[in-house]
Structure formats: structure tokens, C-alpha cells
Swiss-Prot record:
Residue ranges of the region described as Sigma-70 factor domain-3: 459-535
Keywords carried by this UniProt record: Cytoplasm, DNA-binding, Sigma factor, Transcription, Transcription regulation
Keyword NAD: no
Family as reported in the entry's similarity comment: Belongs to the sigma-70 factor family. RpoD/SigA subfamily.
Region described as Sigma-70 factor domain-4: 548-601
Motif Interaction with polymerase core subunit RpoC positions after renumbering to this chain: 404-407
Biased composition (Acidic residues): 193-209
Identification of the protein by name: RNA polymerase sigma factor RpoD
PANTHER family tied to this protein: RNA POLYMERASE SIGMA FACTOR RPO, RNA POLYMERASE SIGMA FACTOR RPOD
Gene name of the encoded protein: rpoD
Sigma-70 factor domain-2: annotated segments: 380-450
Quaternary structure note: Interacts transiently with the RNA polymerase catalytic core.
Subcellular location: Cytoplasm
Length: 614
């Protein structure tokens, strides 16, 4: 009997006993569980499943009164079904310890998309981006920024640095369900309640030429009249007094701005301006809450109830300090600091031309649009993870682990989702395949080698190898560097450099021979080390030299030692030796010549002559 069948038989026996007795004890459950299940959480999951079958698990055997409440059921089919389910759960519990299996299993639960499903998700991505654009269009300076970029294009800058396309309003795109209201209006307040659930649920193309798109977005009917009729940098008080016509013009600007598809760099610049304003606002609000709640001991609930709509009312803290509350006196001491923070909020309102509520509303609308686009992109990515697996399998054994190939392919998949244009008519998988292959091959070229080689050099090496194989088939032998250079139209020196770079490094621990006791590093010569023969020869020469010098007089031996630096740090000139002996340099030369004549005598020279041959 196989291990799995035996395991299922034991579980079936356990469940049958539980149904006959009406209960099980923890000891009985523990005796019947497989030995490899020891995690307390896994045991709790199994006991919970047994309880779901109607079998109670007790610390010890219950009394007779408790057993009367349980109905014994020994249905064989029910026991087998329960045992199979429990065995499957146990197998699943063990399987979840492997992150790769978890990834594969969760990936398999997502259904593949049809062409219509891809279009629907792509439209949701566009709709989310349109909502973001519509929200930031109401932020002061946004339209001015776009018109400034349009002027740069007219002066010769590349349009592709500003726009990536234009969403045709006449196309069958699912338009936003409602217009994006102007922040601060009643319509915006009403829509805020309707979108609360949308925001909380998120934790976190045949296109026209861009030139025509930007020209359309800067129609004279709005953009030319825009600076003169009302300023994008007016203060909040002036904006609250807008006549209805100017409000419609502002909405028209937002409507024109929404279809524009900016390049990511330009899009991020505009979004970052809104985020920066909100971060400055939040920073001051947190400082005020810290002063009130932490320092003045004001209840947090009271602060959250009283502070909204009083962000820029500099009399707010003073009025609260006059109340008869436990924290009023402490709040009065912090009044100056609170007013200073409120003054910074007033300065922010003056700088942006928006009230605090309007800044929050613009950011809320922008966050909702980003959440919609992010969710749609996530669905598109998850539905195509299997495509990455199928492509990554073709690039195994090229220097990167399979999981690394999958991760690099997923990066390419996410880029494909960002750049997919469903209006061109092809399926997403057709388009994404090239992005995934590009990401995987680039990562292999960039990371697979121990010594990194630039990607352009990798491409040259691959081309060289391909042509070398072709020439090998044509000529029946390996081509020479000269022949390769002629075929590739490259200098011979560069061909030799490429061939040298193309060599793969090997480990010094590579086994050599059948016994594998020796390694490649054992056979590599260390050029910095002296050979034993050379060291022995030098030592013998030193000993022979000392013996020969010992046959001279002490004065002659010392002169020769000083002249040639024997047993000294350096040699000496005749002048230096003469000063040592307090004689002239000529006398030292005579002593040296006499010592040389003695050394040339055959009885002494024969000891040193043998070293000349070595």
C-alpha cells in the first residue's frame, strides 16, 4: 500500500471512530496524524475540519450526558468522502510551505482573458487615467504647464517628450460615468460620498498623431481665452466667487485635458505637484493634532470632531481654551504654536489658490483614479502570468535560475500592460510576448556571467558565434580571426578581443580526473612563488661564498663584503670603504685586487665555478 493510501486509510479509521463514539480526543487525533505534520497551526486546521464534520474533539472522554447529545453516524460513503477531503487538506497544507508551488497554484486559479476581456480591462485602465487627469486639471498651474510644454514643442522640442497619444472621444471607449466635478462645489461633495467605497476598497488604440492631439487640446475657444478670462492662480476667495460661466469654462478645460495621454515623466510631474501640496497640508495637520492630543491631552475623538472645517480659523484654539474643560488650560498654552501651523496652511491656500478642502478633494479624486487603473493593471498581469512561465521555460540553463527568469519576465509583462494599445487590433499576449522575451534576454545578458559584460558586447559575441558556426559548416573547419573579420566587416584586432572576452570563466574547484580528489586550482602555477630548486641553489651559493671568503684575511674579506653588499643591506663605493678603514680609495682598490687574485686560484675558484653553469 502506498504512503498516501495508507495515510487516507488511517484518517478514514479516525473519522469512523469519531462517528461511532460521537467524539474524538486530542490524543486519538494525534495518534492518527502523519508524522510529518507537527506545526500547531496545521493541527488546528485539521481539528477545525473534523469539527466541521460534526465530530467534537475533547481533551478527554466526555461523560454520558454529553454523549446523548451526539448522534452516531457510521455511513461508509460519508467517512470515505470526509477522509479524502481531510487528506487533501493535509496535502495542501504541506504543499504551501513551498513558495514556488504556492505561486503556481494561485496563478492557476486566475482564468485566461478573452479578447473582449482584454479590451474591457484596457478601457478600465484608460478610464482610471482619465479620472486622474480630470482631477489634476483642477489643480492650479496644470493647464498652464501643458500649454508651456506646447510652446516648447512649437520652438522645436520633440512632441514625444510630452505626449504619448490621445484618447479619441468619438471612439467606443467607456466614458466616465459622470463628469469630474469642480472641487469645492456641491456636486463634488455629493460625489465624494458615492466614491468612498471605491477608495476604501483599494489598499494601496488607433490614436491620432500627437501633434494633432496637442493642437486639439489647445483650441483657441478655451486655451487662448483662458489666461485673460480667469487666472489659474487666483486665491480661494476669488475662486469661490466664480460666475457660472467661468465654472463651465474650467470644467471645459478639464474635459479637454482628460483625453490627453502624457508620457510617464510628464504625468508624474503633475501628480507629484498635487501630492506635494497634500503632504505639506498633512504635515501641518499632524503637527496641530500632536499639539492638541499629545501635549494638551485633548481627547482624540473631540479633536477629530472639532478640527475639520476649522483648519485655517486662527481663533479656533483660543475659543476652545476658554471652555470649561480639563484640557482647556493646556490647550491655551499651545495656542501660539497652533496658530503658527494654521498660518502655514493659510500660506499654502494662498500659494495654490485652493482651500484645504479643495486640495483634499483633488487628491481624493486622483487617488480613486489611480486605484482603478492599478486594479485593472493587476488583473491584466495576473491573467497573463502563465504566458511568462511558458516563455521563461525556453531560456533555462543559460546562467539564471528559473525563478529569476520568471521575475524578469514579470517585469517585462508589467511594462507591456502599461504600453498596451488595444485599438491596434492585436491580442495582448501577442504584444506582451516581445516585452517578456526582451526582459528575459536582457537580464540573461546582464546578469548571467560571473564577470559582467556590457549588453552591446554580448550581442556582438552572439553574432560572432553565429557566423562562426555558419563558416564551420561551409568550410569544414574553424574559421580564423582574419576570415571572421572579413565576413563581419570588423578589424582583426577587434575580432581577437571579442574572442578573448567570450571565454567563459571556470571554477578553480573543478574536479580533475576520475577520483575527483584533485582540483583545477592544484595545477595552476603560482608565478609569484620561487621554485624549490632556485631557493636551494641560492642557499648553496651563500654557503660557498662564505667558505671562500673565510680563506682570505679579515681585512680582505671585509672589503669584498662591503664592496658587493654580502650579508649587508647595500654595496659600498671605494670612497665609502676607504672612510671605514681610514685609508685612501687607492689603497682599498689595491686590497680588493689582491683579494681577487687569491680567489682566482684554482683551489678556491672551483667551489664557485659550478654555479656559473646554473
Amino acid at each position: 500500500m502506498s504512503g498516501k493510501a495508507q495515510q487516507q486509510s488511517r484518517i478514514k479509521e479516525l473519522i469512523t471512530r469519531g462517528r461511532e463514539q460521537g467524539y474524538l480526543t486530542y490524543a486519538e487525533v494525534n495518534d492518527h496524524l502523519p508524522e510529518d505534520i507537527s506545526d500547531p497551526e496545521q493541527v488546528e486546521d485539521i481539528i477545525r475540519m473534523i469539527n466541521d464534520m460534526g465530530i467534537n474533539v475533547f481533551e478527554s472522554a466526555p461523560d454520558a450526558d454529553a454523549l446523548l447529545l451526539a448522534e452516531a453516524d457510521t455511513d461508509e460513503a460519508a467517512a470515505e468522502e470526509a477522509a479524502a477531503a481531510l487528506a487533501a487538506v493535509e496535502t495542501d497544507i504541506r504543499r504551501t510551505t513551498d513558495p514556488v508551488r504556492m505561486y503556481m497554484r494561485e496563478m492557476g486559479t486566475v482564468e485566461l482573458l478573452t479578447r473582449e476581456g482584454e479590451i474591457e480591462i484596457a478601457k478600465r485602465i484608460e478610464e482610471g487615467i482619465r479620472e486622474v487627469m480630470g482631477a489634476i486639471a483642477h489643480f492650479p498651474g496644470t493647464v498652464d504647464y501643458i500649454l508651456g510644454e506646447y510652446d516648447r514643442v512649437n520652438r522645436g522640442c520633440r512632441l514625444s517628450d510630452v505626449l504619448s497619444g490621445y484618447i479619441d472621444p468619438d471612439d467606443n471607449i467607456a466614458a466616465p460615468t459622470e463628469e469630474v466635478p469642480i472641487p469645492g462645489t456641491k456636486a463634488a461633495a455629493a460625489k465624494e460620498e458615492a466614491d468612498d467605497d471605491e477608495e476604501e476598497s483599494e489598499g494601496g488604440d488607433d490614436e491620432e498623431e500627437p501633434k494633432a492631439a496637442l493642437t486639439r487640446s489647445s483650441q483657441p475657444s478655451v486655451s487662448v481665452r483662458y489666461p485673460s478670462s480667469f487666472s489659474d492662480h487666483q486665491g480661494p476667495e476669488e475662486k469661490r466667487s466664480y460666475p457660472q460661466g467661468k465654472r463651465r469654462a474650467l470644467q471645459a478645460l478639464a474635459d479637454l485635458f482628460m483625453p490627453i495621454k502624457l508620457v510617464p515623466k510628464q504625468f508624474e510631474v503633475l501628480v507629484e505637484r498635487v501630492r506635494d501640496a497634500l503632504n505639506r497640508l498633512r504635515q501641518q495637520e499632524r503637527a496641530i493634532m500632536q499639539l492638541c492630543v499629545r501635549d494638551a491631552r485633548m481627547p482624540r475623538a473631540d479633536f477629530l470632531r472639532m478640527f475639520p472645517s476649522n483648519e485655517t480659523d486662527q481663533t479656533w484654539s483660543g475659543d476652545l481654551a476658554k471652555r470649561n474643560t480639563k484640557w482647556a488650560a493646556a490647550l491655551g498654552e499651545k495656542d501660539a504654536a497652533i496658530v503658527a501651523c494654521q498660518q502655514k496652511l493659510i500660506d499654502l491656500e494662498t500659494e495654490t489658490g485652493l482651500t484645504v478642502a479643495e486640495i483634499k478633494e483633488i487628491n481624493r479624486r486622483m487617488s480613486i483614479g489611480e486605484a482603478k487603473a492599478r486594479r485593472a493593471k493587476k488583473e491584466m498581469v495576473e491573467a497573463n502570468l502563465r504566458l511568462v512561465i511558458s516563455i521563461a521555460k525556453k531560456y533555462t540553463n543559460r546562467g539564471l535560475q528559473f525563478l529569476d527568469l520568471i521575475q524578469e519576465g514579470n517585469i517585462g509583462l508589467m511594462k507591456a500592460v502599461d504600453k498596451f494599445e488595444y485599438r491596434r487590433g492585436y491580442k495582448f499576449s501577442t504584444y506582451a510576448t516581445w516585452w517578456i522575451r526582451q526582459a528575459i534576454t536582457r537580464s540573461i545578458a546582464d546578469q548571467a556571467r560571473t564577470i559582467r559584460i556590457p549588453v552591446h558586447m554580448i550581442e556582438t559575441i552572439n553574432k560572432l558565434n553565429r557566423i562562426s558556426r555558419q563558416m564551420l559548416q561551409e568550410m569544414g573547419r574553424e574559421p580564423t580571426p582574419e576570415e571572421l573579420g572579413e565576413r563581419m566587416e570588423m578589424p582583426e584586432d577587434k575580432i581577437r578581443k571579442v574572442l578573448k572576452i567570450a571565454k567563459e570563466p571556470i571554477s578553480m574547484e573543478t574536479p580533475i580526473g576520475d577520483d575527483e580528489d584533485s582540483h583545477l586550482g592544484d595545477f595552476i602555477e603560482d608565478s609569484t612563488m620561487q621554485s624549490p630548486i632556485y631557493v636551494a641553489t641560492v642557499e648553496s651559493l651563500k654557503e660557498a661564498t662564505r667558505d671562500v671568503l673565510s680563506g682570505l684575511t679579515a681585512r680582505e674579506a671585509k672589503v669584498l663584503r662591503m664592496r658587493f653588499g654580502i650579508d649587508m643591506n647595500t654595496d659600498h663605493t671605494l670612497e665609502e670603504v676607504g672612510k671605514q678603514f681610514d685609508v685612501t680609495r687607492e689603497r682599498i682598490r689595491q686590497i680588493e685586487a689582491k683579494a681577487w687574485r687569491k680567489l682566482r686560484h684554482p683551489t678556491r675558484s672551483e667551489h664557485l665555478r659550478s654555479f656559473l653553469d646554473e
